[in-house]
């Protein structure tokens, strides 16, 4: 209510709805307000997730105090926002206007995704060394499978997140809201995102390989156990057979 009274801006009731259609997430109102709803990654170790953020930007209606002010609505703090605030304090001239703020947020989100991918590489390298060592128990294999599955989930979230960032940046470029320098920066962000796509694809292949290798070691261990039981059964067969023969009653067998 305060925002509407002071800035003349109405926050849509469905600002945080989980819409999938692009037309419902990136659009321009008749009054010139730009609406962008985009997801930002939180690579939490225990609960990785994406957070929906809604942005509203008035670039045309100079009669309102909201002119040139970027409004953001989100349910929790996002690492990318904290990172940009820190950079802005260190370099006051970094953000020249609201459009630059929005663009830098998407740039930082792509950078954050890249850093998270590097962390996934490190985690998978540790798992790979353990699996390929050949000395893996079932308990160790179970832990490795759990670790690999968590990295697969995070990798999938990154892939979806950068896809969403690409759509948001492309919308900003199509809306003709960026100056020449900002437009070139947006193109660079898209190039960075394209490079991340190949990394996520490679990680999916590596994850599948490690999962297959781990499951293979589990099967080998199980086959060893079955073989031990089979040998034990054969070794115990003669005494069992003799005991059975001695336990038979031959008196009423006509063949004898």
Predicted regions: what is each one?
Residues 168-183, 210-221:
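Long amphipathic alpha-helical coiled-coil segments
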Residues 194-256:
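Hydrophobic alpha-helical transmembrane segments and their immediately adjacent juxtamembrane loops
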Residues 1-174, 178-179, 188, 192-195, ...:
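Peripheral, non-transmembrane regulatory/ligand-interaction domains of membrane transport proteins
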Residues 138-139, 176-182, 247, 252-255:
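Conserved catalytic-core motifs characterized by acidic clusters
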């Amino acid at each position: 209510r305060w925002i509407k009274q002071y800035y003349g801006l109405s926050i849509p009731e469905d600002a945080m709805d989980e819409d999938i259609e692009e037309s419902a997430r990136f659009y321009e109102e008749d009054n010139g307000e730009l609406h962008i709803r985009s997801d930002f990654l939180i690579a939490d170790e225990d609960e990785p997730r994406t957070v929906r953020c809604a942005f509203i930007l008035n670039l045309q209606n100079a009669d309102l105090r909201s002119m040139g002010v970027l409004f953001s609505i989100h349910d929790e703090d996002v690492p990318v926002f904290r990172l940009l605030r820190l950079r802005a304090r260190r370099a006051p001239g970094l953000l020249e206007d609201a459009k630059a703020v929005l663009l830098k947020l998407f740039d930082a989100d792509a950078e954050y995704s890249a850093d998270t991918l590097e962390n996934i590489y490190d985690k998978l390298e540790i798992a790979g060394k353990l699996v390929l060592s050949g000395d893996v128990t079932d308990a160790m294999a179970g832990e490795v499978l759990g670790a690999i599955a968590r990295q697969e989930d995070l990798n999938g979230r990154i892939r979806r997140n950068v896809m969403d960032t690409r759509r948001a940046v492309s919308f900003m470029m199509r809306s003709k809201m960026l100056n020449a320098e900002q437009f070139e920066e947006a193109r660079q962000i898209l190039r960075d995102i394209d490079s991340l796509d190949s990394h996520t694809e490679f990680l999916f292949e590596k994850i599948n390989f490690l999962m297959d290798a781990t499951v293979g070691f589990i099967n080998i261990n199980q086959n060893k156990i079955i073989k031990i039981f089979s040998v034990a059964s054969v070794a115990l067969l003669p005494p069992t057979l003799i005991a059975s023969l001695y336990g038979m009653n031959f008196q009423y067998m006509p063949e004898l």
